[in-house]
Regions:
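Short loop/turn motifs that connect adjacent beta-strands in outer-membrane beta-barrel proteins
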Residues: 100, 116-123, 158-163, 243, ...
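Short acidic/polar hinge/loop motifs at secondary-structure boundaries
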Residues: 48, 65-94, 144, 151
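Gram-negative outer-membrane beta-barrel transporters
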Residues: 653-662, 667-779, 819
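Predominantly transmembrane beta-strands of Gram-negative outer membrane beta-barrel pores used
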Residues: 21, 59, 89, 93, ...
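Outer-membrane beta-barrel signature, preferentially recognizing the C-terminal barrel domain
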Residues: 287-302, 495, 499-506, 561, ...
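C-terminal beta-signal and adjacent terminal beta-strands/loops
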Residues: 434, 706, 770-780, 802-853
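Transmembrane beta-barrel wall of Gram-negative outer-membrane proteins
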Residues: 142-270, 290, 297-308, 314-317, ...
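Extracytoplasmic beta-strand/coil segments of soluble accessory domains associated
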Residues: 19-66, 94
Length: 853
């Protein structure tokens, strides 16, 4: 069961990424890869969710071959890398047969490349557009115009046109400025205190509290974002006869994201409960404003080469061979600096959150606006390099198995996947000192520099109209730090090694699939044996070793893991009439554990002998014994075609029974031996725990009005789809407590898409609306019940209008996010919702020209 969008449709809306396209497919939506608590802006949606299951457990492929992806912790592909112009079709595969990679709890996204044999003569296009983002250039930098340039050329050649060649490329540049308000994006933001007014104790359970949420950490971010993307692909094809086809595909994909984040943080001393507290108001006894800066460029490069050969030895027997190598690398820099004053009664604030968004009032705005009271808290440099190489081989022998074959047939094959994945970090931290008049031999004994020396214009508003948002001039601060020799005042050597790891993962699979096909009935039943073996090289802390520097306590370690599965599938389709197609399927798929669960280093705390009768020690570790999530999937669908195939009504239902969900839990081990002594050990590690279920219904409608309305109204076509998703899901926190958070993370209950297009002579237009219901975005805490974050309903309108000047030249006007819809997330409490965070998104207007060959 596969839904997809072809290239002819892809170009009719201002979709900039594959994820933008995929979200128009029934049951698919796109989500930001950062989350509300992430350090980056949420201006781009990079990951997709199929039928309500996390992007970590979906597989993205090019022509069926997996492609390398470089992430610190998970397996999700960065879909923003791949421009729509190079793709002939985007497919959401929702039932995974035995001959396919089983990593896809809810499905897979397959990008089908263009073939030179798609048409009988050479074809191509060149498209150039210039755009303006309504938010660009609103902070410091005067950002320029957005640019998109894409081109594709395909031709066949040879004495019998037996050779084909496709070349495509793209260059894109996007600018955006984003204001993000985040009073509740992290677990340590809204605090709850006990119902004892004399106590300053905080609690994690609403039932144990006084029922009043206190906004302790009120952040405002200003992001300046510049993205530059480029790609180049080529495909050489050979089709000497109808029996043989071979291709060699090569692709290079590049993204350079330059992002600056300015921070204004109003924070209180949570150790003292607010005075005069009510449900919506309160006065913090101590508080301050912190000013921060982060420069966080991220450079991503992915290359891929794939070869494929299919050959029919006879009318009944054929082979299908695929070999692929891909490599991905992400280089990330995070240069950070911060200024802050002492926590004080003179710089504190009160709050009023009756509107759902905390509004602050400072007791002394003049003092809070004085940057001279803030000293340098830190200056940091952090570099991360993430790499992955992926080798993929697949080969199959087929007998009477082609689409037009009839009777019994089979497919026998095997596949091999090897991933070599590594992560490396370098991290240093120091301070900048005021050497004017300082005679100390050691510069670190001089006073710290103050913020008034490093303020960058302009200033911006905050939730208090009398208090301004000051920007840090990090360039000047960093230049002084370099001139002073980069004095390092905090030992970050442990942070430079404790997250480093290398994983070498190999997957072997063998599959057998039987087929029975008639003119109306097609049944495919298969079984796959899938075995995974992996070695992990990492570093673990040994507290018995000297800790000067901190990294000296880390020693190399090795882990290994393996697991295997038998994965059955049966997929059937039946043409009940010439206009009605019925489908049903049972499949079993898996979701391999994210790297973050396996690579976690083992760390021991110092033994706690405070109570001699119960000595304790804490241990944090990964779990090489984790098993993948396993899902038994049941699907059924019906499609009715009318208007000579130009119109369609469809309905699909699905049910997924998922086992072995992964949670981070804490368990106690009595009589744990450490250095010859016995302790009660508290072990924090990921484990497989409960199961869950996901179910839903998808509706689709396409209506062509050509035979219903008179000219000129016969040019209308209406497309719409709706998906309803439900689930049974129990969350287990670190303490082992269970609760129902209301659904899976990133699982909207309702998704709607509607598109209305019109063609009349040389004029064409299309308007699209995409709506996503509220969904659980984050579970931020290891314990308690007051930390869940919900993404609010979001609807986006996009449109395009075009006019054919000639048979080859078309001018286009496009608008993305017509109503400037923002992203908003709320924290849910029994007393009502409070803002977790919101992010503005601009309207982008494009004007372009398309040359069709």
């Amino acid at each position: 069961i596969t839904d997809g969008i072809n290239q002819d449709t892809i170009g009719l809306l201002p979709d900039l990424t594959v994820a933008d396209i995929a979200r128009r497919i029934p049951g698919v939506t796109s989500v930001s890869s950062t989350g509300v608590a992430g350090p980056r802006s949420q201006s781009a949606s990079e990951n997709i969710v199929i039928r309500g299951l996390a992007p970590d457990y979906n597989l993205s492929t090019f022509d069926g071959a997996p492609i390398a992806t470089a992430s610190e912790s998970n397996r999700a592909a960065n879909l923003s890398l791949f421009p729509p112009a190079i793709v002939g079709r985007v497919e959401a595969i929702k039932t995974i047969s035995a001959d396919m990679n089983p990593h896809g709890l809810s499905g897979q996204l397959n990008l089908v490349t263009t073939s030179a044999f798609d048409r009988d003569e050479p074809f191509g296009n060149l498209r150039v557009s210039v755009g303006e983002n309504s938010t660009a250039g609103k902070v410091v930098d005067d950002q320029g115009e957005n640019i998109r340039a894409t081109g594709l050329y395909a031709t066949s050649f040879g004495s019998q046109d037996q050779f084909g060649f496709v070349a495509a490329g793209s260059f894109e540049k996007f600018y955006a400025t984003t204001r993000a308000v985040r009073p509740g994006g992290e677990s340590g933001t809204y605090y709850f205190y006990t119902d004892d007014p004399a106590s300053n104790e905080t609690v994690d359970s609403f039932a144990d509290s006084n029922g009043f949420a206190a906004p302790r950490r009120n952040q405002i971010y200003l992001f300046e974002n510049e993205q530059e993307r480029a790609s180049a692909v080529a495909k050489l094809e050979w089709r000497p006869s109808a029996a043989t086809y071979a291709s060699l595909f090569g692709g290079w994909f590049y993204q350079d994201e330059q992002e600056v984040r300015h921070e204004h943080l109003a924070i209180s001393n949570q150790g003292i409960r607010p005075e005069n507290q009510t449900e919506n108001t309160g006065d913090w006894t101590q508080g301050r404003i912190e000013a921060g800066y982060v420069y966080q460029p991220e450079e991503t490069t992915t290359t891929a080469i794939t070869g494929r050969l299919t050959h029919d030895f006879s009318e009944d027997n054929a082979i299908d061979l695929t070999a692929s190598f891909s490599s991905a690398e992400v280089d990330i820099v995070r240069n950070m600096s911060k200024f802050l004053p002492a926590m004080s009664e003179d710089t504190t604030f009160s709050y009023d959150q009756s509107s759902g968004n905390p509004l602050l009032t400072f007791v002394n705005p003049d003092l809070s606006n004085d940057p001279s009271i803030s000293s340098n808290s830190y200056i940091r440099e952090r570099y991360q390099d993430i790499k992955q190489d992926l080798i993929y081989l697949d080969g199959a022998w087929m007998h009477n198995y082609e689409e037009d074959d009839r009777g019994f047939g089979y497919k026998l094959g095997g596949s091999f996947v090897n991933r070599s994945h590594s992560f490396d970090r370098e991290y240093i931290e120091g301070d900048v000192f005021n050497t004017d008049g300082c005679t100390e031999a050691d510069i670190t004994n001089c006073p710290l520099v103050t913020f008034d020396q490093y303020v960058e214009d302009p200033t911006f508003s905050t939730t208090d109209p009398n208090v301004r948002f000051f920007l840090v001039d990090d360039a000047a601060l960093r230049a002084d730090w370099i001139a002073q020799g980069k004095p390092q005042t905090t030992d970050r050597t442990d942070n430079s090694i404790n997250t480093d790891y290398e994983i070498d993962e190999t997957i072997y699979a063998f599959y057998a699939q039987a087929a029975y096909q008639t003119d109306r009935l097609k049944v495919h039943a298969g079984l796959r044996y899938d075995k995974t073996e992996a070695d992990v090289d990492l570093y673990i802390r040994d507290v018995r070793l000297p800790s000067d520097p901190d990294s000296a306590q880390f020693v190399p370690a090795k882990r290994s893991y393996e697991y295997d599965f038998l994965l059955p599938s049966i997929i059937a389709s039946y043409e009940a009439t010439d206009d009605v197609l019925l489908r049903a399927a049972y499949t079993r798929t898996i979701g391999r554990p994210n790297f973050e669960y396996i690579k976690r280093g083992e760390a021991y705390s110092a033994p706690d002998d405070t109570d001699p009768s119960d000595p304790r020690i804490s241990i944090s570790r990964g779990n090489p014994d984790l098993k993948p999530l396993v899902s038994d999937n049941f699907d059924i669908s019906a499609e009715y075609y009318f208007d000579n195939g130009g119109s369609l009504i469809s309905i699909a239902g699905f049910y997924k029974d998922v086992d072995d969900l992964i949670y981070i839990v804490t368990a106690e081990i009595p009589d744990f031996e450490y250095e010859g002594n016995l302790y009660t050990a508290t072990v924090n590690q990921p484990v497989n725990a409960t199961g869950a279920s996901v179910y839903g219904v998808e509706f689709g409608l396409r209506k062509d009005f050509a035979d219903l309305l008179p000219a000129p109204f016969d040019g209308f076509v209406f497309d719409a789809n709706a998906t309803w998703i439900g689930s049974e899901f129990t969350y287990i926190n670190a303490e082992g407590d269970e609760r129902d958070p209301g659904g899976w993370v990133n699982q909207p209950e309702l998704m709607l898409n509607a598109q209305l297009s019109y063609e009349y002579g040389p004029f064409g237009a299309k308007i699209a609306y995409s709506w996503v219901d509220e969904y659980l975005s984050n579970i931020l805490a290891d314990s308690g019940d007051v930390y869940d974050v919900y993404a609010q309903p979001n609807g986006v309108i996009d449109m395009q209008a075009r006019y054919e000047l000639t048979d080859r030249i078309t001018i286009l006007g496009e608008v993305q996010n017509v109503t400037e819809e923002k992203l908003e997330f709320n924290r849910r409490f029994p007393t009502g919702d409070l803002l977790s965070g919101n992010t503005q998104r601009g309207r982008v207007v494009w004007l372009g020209v398309n040359f069709q060959y």
